[in-house]
Structures are given as C-alpha cells and as structure tokens.
From Swiss-Prot:
Residues 881-901, 947-988, 1006-1037 are annotated as: Disordered. Residues 948-965 have a biased composition (Polar residues). Belongs to the EFR3 family. It comes from the Eukaryota. This is Protein EFR3. One of its GO terms (biological process) is protein localization to plasma membrane. Disulfide bonds: none annotated. Residues 966-977 have a biased composition (Basic and acidic residues).
Amino acid sequence: MCIPKSNHKKLVDDCYPPPKALITSAPEYRPNSNELGRLTYYAQNKPAKLTKVGNLLESKAQADARAAKASGPAADKGKAALMITLAITKNLLTECKNSLNYFIKPSQSIIAAALDAAQPTSARPRDLEISARAASAFYALASFLDPASSVVDEGFQRLLRSFALLAVERPLGADATLGEDAEQRNRTRLIGLGALAGAVASDAIYSSNFKQLLSLLTPALVENAKANRVTLDWLRSESNKATEGEPTYAEFNIAKKPLAIRRTRSISAHVAGEKGPSSEDVISAAIGTLRGLLRHADAAQVQSIVQNVIAWLDNKSALSIPVPKDGRQLVSHWDDPEWCCWLAESLCSWTSLQYRFVVLDTLVDHLAENGEGKATNKHLSLIQMSRTILTGQLSLIGLSTSDTLSNLCALAVRRVYKDTRDSLLPPLVDCISGLGTHVYYADQINDIVEEISGRIAALQMPESISDAASVKASNNLGAVHRGQQQDLSSHLHRQRLANAGPEQRDESIRVLLFCLQGVLKATHQSSGEIHEAVDVKSNGAEKGKAAAASTDSKIGLAHAGTRNRVAPASILPTASLLASPNHAVRLAYAQTLITLFRDEFDREQLERESAVFAAAPIGEKVSDAIGVVHAIGAAAHVMCLSKSLSPPAQVLGNLRESPLELLPQIDRINADPGRPGSLSSGGSGTPAAESTAALPVDYVAVAQALEHAVTALPCSAALALTPMLVALDKDAGSRLTVHGATVNTGLENQRRLSSRMVAARVLAKLGETFDTDSVSRAAQGVLSQIPSLGIEPGPSPVGGLTLPSEVVPFSAVGSINQLGESSSSSSPSLNGALVINSLASSSKLQSATQLDAATLKRWLERDWNVGIAVDEAFAGSSPYAHSSLGTGSQQASRRPSYTPINGLSAGGNAFVNGSNASSASVNKNSRISMQAPSTGVNDLREALGTAASLSSKQANGTTQDGSLSTDRRASRRESRRGPVVTSANGSNGTSAVAILDSLKVGVDEDASRLGRDTSWSAIPAKGITNGTAPISPPYTS
C-alpha cells in the first residue's frame, strides 16, 4: 500500500541517497544535488514551509546523532545521514537568508545534535568530520543572522560556547600516558576557530547582548595566541602581518561585508595522509580573528574585550579553559610581562583609530581599582602594558591625558603612603612619563605640569585640605560598574592618609617631581615640534571657511604634533619646595627647575625682534614669567639663611590657599635668634639636626637652577632676582655671623659662605648675560675667596626614579671648614649699590626690557624681603604699567599670601621681625577676616597713580612701636606698582583723583569733623609732604 507523503517531506527525503548507499557516500557525504535544488526552490517560494522542513530535518538529525554515538555499521550509517543533514541545513541557511527566522531554531538544534554526536568517548577520539561540517553550518547561520529582525537567544550562545570550548580543547593521544596529541589538538582548535571566525564576521556578535558573547569569544582567541609554542619575535611579526590584513593563515581572514553579498566558508576536516596544521597556523588564525573582532568593535565592545582579556589573565574567564594534561602546572599569565606588553600593544594596534584609547583607559582603570595590597606580578605587568601603549608608535586620538594622569598619580601616592620604598614606584614613574611621548593637543604638556603641580601643592597643605584634594583626584576613575570599588578605595585612602606622616608626604612629592621630569624628558625625546600659539585672524576672503579651521588657528595647531611650551606660572604653587625640610625633595625640585629652565620655558630674547616675526611684547613675556621667579627667589632666600626648615605644626595649620604662605613665616621664625630649639651657632651640629636645614648640595643645586633661570628668562631674572641677591648677601652677613671660639667649624660660617657663593654665582651670570663687567668682576672676586664645595648634583637622574641620595653634611666638606670668620664677615661682600647701578646702566638690559635706566634703577632698589616677594609672586609684579592693574580674575590672588599676625599690613619688614608669641595670640577667625580680599576707593586711587593723605598713611603702614615708615619705603612701594601713565589720569585738576577728592569720596567725614588726630601730630609726615616724583612710562612716542 502506498502511503502518500506531504510535499516538503518528499522533497527532504529525496535529498538523501538510498539507505543502502548512505555508507558509500563517504568521504564527501553530499546530498543529491538535483533534489536539493528542488527543496531550496520550494523553500524560497514558500518561506513559511521552512518551519516544517526544519522540524523534519531536526528529527532526522536527533535520530542520526544517537546512532552515530554507537559503534559498528549502524554508527557509520548514522554518521553519513547526519553529515548529509548538516549539508542540507547549510545550503538552506545560505540560500534562504531572507527567510531565516523560520529556520533559526531547527538549525541551531541540528548543529547542537551534531556537536554532541562528535564528542570524544573512551572508545574513540572526537569525530573531526562531524565537527567540521557542524562548524560550516554554524558559520552560515552566524553570517546571515540579522539581530535587527532575529533574536540572538540562548541557543546561539550555547553553540558559541561549544565552539569556543572546541577552540581550546586539549585532546589526548592514543596513549594517554604520553599526554596531548599535538596534531589532533591543532586540527580540533582550527575547526573551532573557524566557527568563531564566522561569529566575528556576523552582526550577532555586535548586538545588545554582546557582553555575554564576547566573554566566550575573547578567552578562546587569546588562549591560542600564547607564546608557549612560538617565540615572541614571531608573534610580533605575525601581529604586524595581521594589522596589515595579511596573516600567515588567511583561511579565516575576517572581511565583514553587507548581508546581501556575504559568502560562507566550508570548514573541512583534515584529510588523511596530509601533513596536519602547525601550531603557527593555529596562532595565526587566532590572531587574525581577534584582529577582526577588534577592528569592527565600537568603544563599549572594545572595553568589554579588554576586560575579558584581563579576566582571562586572572584565570577567571567565563569560558572554562582546560588545564594541561601533560603534567605541566598551570602558571599565571601575568608572570610573563613581555608577552603581556606585546598583547596590549597588539590589541591597541588592531582596534580602530578612534577607539584605541579605550584599551589604555581600561587597563589603567583596572590598575587603579586593584592597586592596593602587596606588589605582585599582575601590578607590574599592568603598569608595563600601559607604558608600552603610551610610549609606542600608535596614536591614541581621544585619550583623556588628564584622567589617565590623575589615576596613575593617585595610585603612586597611595603606594607611597603604604610603603615609601614600594617596588612599583619606579615603573609607575616611567609609565606616567610616557604621557609626554605623544602630543594630542597644543596645551597637553602644560596641563600635565599643572596637574602634577596641583597635586604637589595639595600634599603640602594641611591634612584637612590635602586629604580632600587627594581623595577627590584618586576617585576620578571615569567608568561604569565601579561605585563600590570607588567607595572602598576612597575609604582606604583616607584611612591611610590619616595614619601617614611627613615621610610619606615628602616621598610622595619627590615621586611626583620625578614624574614631572620624566614627562618633560619624554616630550623632548619625541619627534613633536614646538610651536608657539598664534591667534590667526581670518580676513574677509576667508570668512567662508569652516569654523573648525578657525578654531585650530586660535589655539596654535598649525600642524599635527605641534604644541605650546609650558607656561612658567604652572609651577608657581610648587616654588616653596626649595625650602622643604626634606633634603631629597629640595634636590629633586632643584633638578626639576633646571630641566624646565633649560629645556622647556620659552626663552626671552635679548635682541629686539623684527616687526614681522615678533611674538608677544617683552612686557607681556615678563609679566607671564616674573611671578615664578619672584617665588623661586623668595624660596631660595629662605633655604639659604634658615637654621631649620621644619615649620611648627601651628604654622602649617594656618595655611589656607597656597604653600607659598609658609615662606614668610619660616623666614620670620629663623630671623629670631632667641627662638627655642634653634641650632647651636657654635657647634658643628649633628647630622639629624643639620639635615633639617640646607646642605652643601642644596646650595650648589639652587645656584645652578638660578643660573639656568638667568639663561632662559634673563629679563625676568634680572628684575626679580637682583634685589633678592643683594639682600641675600647682606642678610648672610647679619644673620649667619656668630662670634665664638668654635666659629671655624660652625654651621653658621659654612652657610654664610655658601649663601654668598649662591649670590655671587647668579650675579656673575647676570653680569655675563648683560655685559656688565663691574658686576662680573665683583662676583668673581667673591667666588675666588670661597672654596668649592666639591659637589655637583647634575640636572636630573638618568634612570628615572632613584632612591634619595645620602646626606652629605657640611662637616664632610673639608675645604669650607678651613675658612674661619674674618672681621668683615658681617659686612656685605658685594656692593649692592654698585650692582644695581651697573645693571640699570646696562644698555643690553635696557634694550631687552625696553625700560630706561631711571625706571630700572627705581625697580631694582625697591624694598625686598620674603613677604614682599611672595606678594609680588602672586601679583606678578613687574615694572610695566599693565602689571599693576590686574584684571578682575587676578585681584583675588593679590591679597597677602600669609597671615598678618600684628594686625597691620604685611608688606614691610615689621612683620618679618615679629615675635612668635604674636602668632599664637591671633585666633583663626581674626586671621580670616584680615585676609579677606577687598577692593575699595583707596585701591582705585592707587591704581590711578596718586593717593590722598589718608591713603598714604594706610599704604605706608606702621612699625610695631607705632612709628610711620620712612618716605623711602613709601616711594619704593610706589615703584613696585610700575610706571604710571599720567596721560590716562587727566590733568589741570580734572583727573579722576581730583574729582574723587572734590566729592570727598573715600574720606571719613565723621573723622574729619573731629579734627586732626593728636596721636599723629608729633610725627613728621615726610612720606606725605615729600612725595616721590612720578616715573616716566617706558613707552613714549
């Protein structure tokens, strides 16, 4: 009896050979071609029938898979039928790709049944023919799967997991005691990698659930790219080939094309008798597939890939990697830093240009999150991987250098606070230095210097301020799913900071200084060319150009790789480090200054530039740089003359905005000879006590730094340092001179000679720079009488972060100890008036600064002390008119930089000579009220170039005994405001000041009605009646 069949069943059955001929269909196992064509045509014209066709094929595959697991002729027959079913499935997936939704479920079940039938058993190894045919069908399924219209469900993930496990399988040989069968392993893994290549080339892998899929794909690919079977040089060569799209094994080369024109690949098993694939073929296939995966990934997918690589390195990947079966122990992949660096660089090079920075960001974020605890090989490898990317030849467009620097610097500080000799600190410094290798925007290096300077300044501030700033910086991790880790890191960091002492703080500062030096060194070793920023104004013919082009011209981006030089003001908060109580910090900062002055800061030209190529006017250049020179000069003065650089805790607690506020207070404390705990003036001192003050190497280092400052910024140095040097020579004789029997070996004598050596060396450099022979001869005469200290620290260490140098006290410098104190030790060794007159008369200085001799002399002979210098540093004071009239944003920084303890103006010498008791008598609230910045009518009068009698009294201030300051001091403070352009103020009683006087603006009327204050009547007001003559402006036409 003939039982009729449905049309789809008849078409499917006709595709198979007769039952007796199934076994003879080996080894091709092909379906009947004509009948397969009819089935395909039927499915294309009736897409809904694909469901029935698929269900029928699925039932056949399940039955044939069960038969194939057995043994004997039945197994061979079942295998043949299963192979033909897989071939029919692949053909339908390829030809009916527009109706794939009807066939996805059955096809996944067919492939899964085939993989289950091919599993190895105790009686036989894995069936590679079934595995290869199943991989080909999966390749077709993945290639034509459209996530927009199809659902990538758990069935697809299970298949992907199965092929990923196939790609990392370790099959045993016929004799299990011999371990793995290398040839069988390579064949098996190559089949699995072929299926994974199909998944990488599909759209399914880049769907919304890409994280689950990538967690299976990535470990399988990286596992096959290890260097245990090939050399690292071969891996580098293969990586370069893959980057160019030409790997050695190109069968699975990923070329993602539009869905309509995609083609499937036939993955075949190894043919008996042929030479099996080599380990190089497997590694090349894995590298090519991984490169294709990264090349088509976006930022989120690249981040997920790198996170899965890190999880695989931790042996915590979502894919279970089998352990070696040949007796070898499983070792951590972090123990091979060279291979890890190759992997990081390769991942970065294979990623699209616009997403390469994600690789580095992910590595740095993971390092910052997991940087606690004992130093391990993982920490070291992560640091070296990050450094390899930063210093490589790859461009990282889009990289946030600020976030990267913040994370790495915060980690370095945390490691220092855990252990000041932590083994990760040198590689961390090298990694941070790598940020200077590539320049991605014009002000990148300047921003890096400002970031590091800000961190250093925060570390010098009181704990309540520095802790908050440091924790805030350390929390800038900028990624997702890290909230709990951030809270834990913040808590640990705050707890560590609370338990830390000055040693950890000083070492943190020293490490950051080495980071700064490393960034500058890497910047100058790179090929980037330095260009000054020029504001290019477009003319009328260029108005139609794109807005982006005009924006580039404004920030000075003329060509790729160009950058602006570091602005001197960026290191202003760090100038007080020259007077740090830690000798290693002082030396590191002096070396940093030498590097900046020698290589980085824009040099001031001594010759007048032509109008065509002239940059900013000299007045603007000086105003930009002189604030830093003021601050460095004040710190150098404090360092040279201080008996102890360790401030009391109460003084440190008074700091509120800037570490520079500390300099005047240290100077005042050391100027008081009766201060308890001061160093003995007659004894040689112990090494512990001597280390709290300047050492011989400090004097030499600061002399070198100031000499480089003269070379790089000659005009600013001459205007800012000359009064300091004259004062240093004078104060060395008055404050470091002790008359006693043991004076020949006293610290005071040694420091006095060293301080005068510093002043003489810098003045000799100034004399040489501005061709003033009298200054050079006078300075050389002083130097000829001072023996050499025999110590030359050099600009900076060559090999990055090193241990602090040993303390070499003055007692170890024999030459200077042989010089006793002469009868003229208390007198200045240099004629200050001669120095000032000679420099003011220098035609070269006048030409360079574009100031006349009278203006220069007035400026150079102004009052100088540390307090004044710090105020001038904040205000950027210079003898140019515009420098005394700051903008609104600058006014707040011009307030006194330290707390006036006597309730009076802190600009004069009265404050410097104050007592310690007065500091303790002022509470915090009063200090805050005295430091509140304000702008009133008197400030307006001073800005307009004159002052009424009342404002003159307030500007001159009083001494502690209530007497008025002399008219000379008033005139010199007036000169610090710069030359006054009188034409701007009007004349003939119509000036703004005259109008203010006529309206009695700013005059206390109630006080005027009471008459003249009798307490002031007996004091001659010379400073009021004999006012100083106005200074002629330097620019007159």
